[in-house]
From Swiss-Prot:
It is found in: Cytoplasm, Cytosol; Nucleus; Cytoplasm; Mitochondrion. GO terms for biological process: fertilization; flagellated sperm motility; mitophagy; protein localization. Interacts (via PQIIIT motif) with PPP3R2 and PPP3CC. Interacts with VDAC2. Interacts with ATG16L1 (via WD repeats). Interacts with PPP3R1, PPP3CA and PPP3CB. The gene is Spata33. This is Spermatogenesis-associated protein 33. Residues 1-60 are annotated as: Interaction with ATG16L1. Plays an important role in sperm motility and male fertility. Required for sperm midpiece flexibility and for the localization of sperm calcineurin to the mitochondria. Promotes mitophagy as well as acts as an autophagy mediator in male germline cells. Links damaged mitochondria to autophagosomes via its binding to the outer mitochondrial membrane protein VDAC2, as well as to key autophagy machinery component ATG16L1. The keyword Transmembrane helix does not apply. Residues 61-132 are annotated as: Interaction with VDAC2.
């Protein structure tokens, strides 16, 4: 019997909720129309505000003049690239014979047990070297 009493109450609550939903939806429509009229009157400002809002979300109107002054004070130095060509100078050495041996760098013949690792070929690395 207690259950039959609660059923009519639920119907009354549903009726109340439908009326409140209708009034809320009408209010939302009115708010949207008001917002659209504001957007139509100032489309350029809203676009500029939206782009600045995305780039700097926490910036205020007071910070903007300060940043402009800072950027005007700091002047960056642009590096200059100078393209040159190869020099025509030659290296002249006096008193030394013009030999290929003098121009190449040769390692010492006696490196001890590590001599085989200094050779560039793998076959020479496994050759037995007797320097004694």
């Amino acid at each position: 019997m207690g259950q039959s009493k609660s059923k009519p109450r639920e119907k009354k609550e549903e009726e109340k909720s439908t009326t409140t939903l209708v009034t809320k939806s009408k209010e939302k429509v009115m708010e949207k129309e008001a917002k659209q009229s504001d957007k139509e009157s100032q489309p350029a400002e809203s676009l500029l505000f939206a782009t600045s809002k995305h780039s700097r979300p926490s910036s205020s109107s007071e910070d903007k003049p300060e940043t402009k002054q800072r950027s005007s004070k700091k002047r960056s130095v642009i590096p200059q690239i100078i393209i040159t060509r190869a020099s025509n100078e030659t290296l002249i050495s006096y008193g030394i014979p013009d030999n290929d041996e003098q121009r190449t760098i040769r390692e010492h013949a006696d490196w001890g047990p590590y001599h085989r690792h200094r050779s560039p070929s793998t076959i020479a690395a496994y050759d037995v070297h007797n320097t004694e």
